Amino acid sequence: MGKIIGIDLGTTNSCVAIMDGTTARVLENAEGDRTTPSIIAYTQDGETLVGQPAKRQAVTNPQNTLFAIKRLIGRRFQDEEVQRDVSIMPYKIVAADNGDAWLDVKGTKTAPPQISAEVLKKMKKTAEDYLGEPVTEAVITVPAYFNDAQRQATKDAGRIAGLEVKRIINEPTAAALAYGLDKEVGNRTIAVYDLGGGTFDISIIEIDEVDGEKTFEVLATNGDTHLGGEDFDTRLINYLVDEFKKDQGIDLRNDPLAMQRLKEAAEKAKIELSSAQQTDVNLPYITADATGPKHMNIKVTRAKLESLVEDLVNRSIEPLKVALQDAGLSVSDINDVILVGGQTRMPMVQKKVAEFFGKEPRKDVNPDEAVAIGAAVQGGVLTGDVKDVLLLDVTPLSLGIETMGGVMTALISKNTTIPTKHSQVFSTAEDNQSAVTIHVLQGERKRASDNKSLGQFNLDGINPAPRGMPQIEVTFDIDADGILHVSAKDKNSGKEQKITIKASSGLNEEEIQKMVREAEANAESDRKFEELVQTRNQGDHLLHSTRKQVEEAGDKLPADDKTAIESALTALESSLKGEDKADIEAKMQALAQASQKLMEIAQQQHAQQQAGSADAQASNAKDDDVVDAEFEEVKDKK
């Protein structure tokens, strides 16, 4: 059985880890970094860039450089959070035919899972380069507060990238695995506060150790899937834009190029202010008007940044209270607080969390890598490489159906340990009703329309009977990935209808298969491109070495041969500028044929050089046999 890799598919950065024996190892990507920016760029010449190369060219290609795609995955275009992003993102967010939020990439509507798949492909390639073997299976993490549609869309992204997603696990749970696996922790209750690039989660987790076996049980989870470092950046960007407008009278919001430079500078300033008290945002030639170029130079203090984002940090505190309440615990019951996600490096975040829990968060967990490590550990559990670990996760939101009067009736309450199964019997609302519609919902509100609709299906063929008589058993079954399967059965007729909940939107099987095929076709074209580059390099090398040999042969090379070689060199040189690998190989072959005489001369010259150096060594050796001696003239005594 091959390795199951662990992938933290983050909003801002992604990370991949594997189990190396009994320890998890975070892998470096091709650029030598342990994390990869979750940025994808589509260049003018049709190339797809992922990670650092995509980030580097963002300033010159803002409309086709996509970031923070995780905020759109599994969401509807009309969602309030999506509409907020529509107005601030440099790229184009559009409505798909089914109402989902998709992206317009160079005039083509593209689904978020398809774009996230590019990041997953890079993670897959990083692992394959390290292991030296194909990788086909992965554990991928998601925010604990992701709903069913978002989890399903993440699995779809994995499939498009050529990965069988063996398990979807929650990010805070993964971080707890990373924290608790190699520590003699005994029985402890920990709080994992996870503030990443685009999402926020809090999970209360109990680690029990009995006879060396550790059980990680999630007691409660809460969060906000649209709160993260990107929002902190946006606050700082808006402040800088407003200051510049006050000073220069120019609104940079209308200039995508300037906004992209500003985004980079704001992110850098935010990071610097975690260790410094103030920083300069210095952007020469940010824009120009009739009077000439304009430069931005604005001082930002840590206190200013904190005042801009204080309400965002406070927004993360409310879910902490709810999670503790749901777990039936008080602050004093928490033994350790673990911070995960890059945004938790901000001193203000650390201070607020410490104030809430009444204790300093632990500093021995890497906030950027813990989640990927935990995913790799879960991969190890699934392959049997990691033993004595049991993970009990929960469903983050209540699941139920719409019943008479537009009410949501929950079948499975939030924070129920998964996998789980629950059945309940319902009946008809009208006399002689022959069909019922099962409308599946996720959320905590009483009114059905205030919750997230996960889909609906019909159960037909109910025998005519007075209202309230037929018995329809509805069963909810949540698997270990947190994905829901629903069935409805008429107990009288035995008729049954089952569905796996795919978001009423989401990607259908046909679309996923099409995207998988496109990804495979891209992989094939990538392979062909790589082979073309290798052939070009060989051709370049042959050009260079042949020219050098012609020069060294001088007059020894007959004029006819020289002309034939020159003509073959010119033909190869022109072929190297094209895209035809077979033609380059043919021209290389033709040059080799024309150069036969040249090869003979080169071999003779080489043999002569060898002989010459052998003679020189031999004469040196003869000289070495001569012993230098001093003679003293002895005169006979007379």
Swiss-Prot record:
Gene3D superfamilies attached to this UniProt entry: 1.20.1270.10, 3.30.420.40, Actin, Chain A, domain 4, Substrate Binding Domain Of DNAk, Chain A, domain 1
Annotated SUPFAM superfamilies: Actin-like ATPase domain, Heat shock protein 70kD (HSP70), C-terminal subdomain, Heat shock protein 70kD (HSP70), peptide-binding domain
Membrane-spanning intervals of the chain: none
Entry-annotated residues carrying Phosphothreonine: 199
Protein name from the UniProt record: Chaperone protein DnaK
One Pfam family here: HSP70
Organism placement in taxonomy: Bacteria, Pseudomonadati, Pseudomonadota, Gammaproteobacteria, Enterobacterales
Keywords: ATP-binding, Chaperone, Nucleotide-binding, Phosphoprotein, Stress response
Organism of provenance: Klebsiella pneumoniae subsp. pneumoniae (strain ATCC 700721 / MGH 78578)
Domain of life: Bacteria
Biological function: Acts as a chaperone.
InterPro entries referenced in this protein's UniProt entry, alphabetically: ATPase_NBD, Chaperone_DnaK, Heat_shock_70_CS, HSP70_C_sf, HSP70_peptide-bd_sf, Hsp_70_fam
Disulfide bonds: none
Gene Ontology terms, MF aspect: ATP binding; ATP-dependent protein folding chaperone; unfolded protein binding
Factors inducing expression: By stress conditions e.g. heat shock.
Low complexity bias (residue ranges): 602-620
Gene name of the encoded protein: dnaK
Family statement drawn from the similarity comment of this UniProt entry: Belongs to the heat shock protein 70 family.
UniProt region (Disordered), positions on chain: 599-638
